[in-house]
């Protein structure tokens, strides 16, 4: 095991710039081991040097076990490739791997971050430095020259090649795309700061015999937009995020809206405010991206979401949080990656969670061909545009809402039905279907579950 010394801060002003879509590209193996946290008193400003009053040693073990120096046991999960969260002895630690603005990152050191008890009644500041492995690596995708201000060129032959290459789905030209720059389309697909590669190897859990037995009687198809028992649909209308990279906020709000309707038997039917998340969340980067685990999960539990009428959606990052502390908010609790930790998610668990508790956010890798999707069961093609001599549409991570699954009656292909946030004119009236059972584009890796608080 390796020693790592970290800085954990509770100051929101610092957090705003450190909590989501960083250039870090770290793995389970990087986080696994023995970490030492130095803790100090709460301060109103980020300290350059912390007067540490105590330290805590926490060991992160396989697959999701956390044990502190006193023998208390808890759990932990990697947060994509950006950091991890530990819950132990009624306290939560949010750790984001250290990085610099030039794209350098260090998987054995943290940025200033949060620690607070699970009741959010008391918080602390802690800081530290790396003991060993004090080496920064470069994420070449982050901050690379991208010609981002160039207007996107629609190449009709590219769409034609997509349709000729395969028959599972059909692409279509959306003329409005030519009005946007490459950076604006990146924002729409996840945000310029989500241009990070998915870990090549996940600490993935395969379905157990018990799980296979438990899910053996699940229906062949299920769709919350049209429940099979004829009941009301809890799925709220399609949103259009515009060119703001707020996709992480839309499915987080939509999932909470749906689950509140189900738990309350439709006695409560809020339409929540993703704009509040864009303006106020210390766990994301406004219009530059974020992750549902930190929004539907942590932000929903720590801060809650007010209704849309409080802060309507503008698709802009104002940088100012104007929400009254006294407004009614809807909260989440008991959030986690499906399966308990990042890497534990699989198809069967996703089906079970979907049917049992309602729609939930997922993330997946967006390639250039996806923006031209019109209908059918999407899978990434190897077709490349020949207009540019570089790849202008670098890989991003896009968050969406899983609402159903089924099997195509013509092709026999299994699929997930997913709600996007690009308006009703895109795809299948705002939805798309994507290949199920193969972790296509990572769609079976980032499912997030939570319970609504009523």
UniProtKB/Swiss-Prot annotation:
One of its GO terms (cellular component) is lysosome. Its cofactor is chloride. Disulfide bonds join 26-107, 244-287, 280-321. GO terms for molecular function: cysteine-type peptidase activity. The keyword Disulfide bond applies. It comes from the Eukaryota. Chloride binds at residues 291, 337. Glycans are attached at residues 25, 265, 326. Its EC number is 3.4.22.-. Binds 1 Cl(-) ion per heavy chain. One of its GO terms (biological process) is proteolysis. Keywords: Disulfide bond, Glycoprotein, Hydrolase, Lysosome, Protease, Signal, Thiol protease, Zymogen. PROSITE patterns: THIOL_PROTEASE_HIS. It is found in: Lysosome. The active site is at residues 247, 398, 420. Residues 21-217 form a propeptide. Residues 1-20 form the signal peptide. CDD domains: Peptidase_C1A_CathepsinC. Belongs to the peptidase C1 family. Thiol protease. Has a role as a digestive enzyme. PANTHER family: CYSTEINE PROTEASE FAMILY C1-RELATED (PTHR12411). This is Cathepsin C.
